[in-house]
Amino acid sequence: MDPPAADPPSLIEYPSAFPIKVMGAHADGFVEAVVAIARRFDPAFDAGSVELRPSRAGNYLGVTITVTATSRAQLDELYRTLSTHPMVKVVL
């Protein structure tokens, strides 16, 4: 029986500033929810660094957060948490 395959080496040097774009409906509480999740994974997260970009029609909002990534596991869990939030449509 072959041993389990090892994870490939990371292309990211940790710790590093890591931008994540989160898109969802332009609704009350969306930005606050994204910021709250970011703070759970990066307690030093600066909400002042959040970038907002509304869609052309204004129905959707792109929120770019930059977190301090400390590990692949942290980023994976952050992406999972954001992706499963009911207000979030897409995480890039």
Q: Residue locations for each model-derived region?
A:
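Long, contiguous binding/interaction regions
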Residues: 1-92
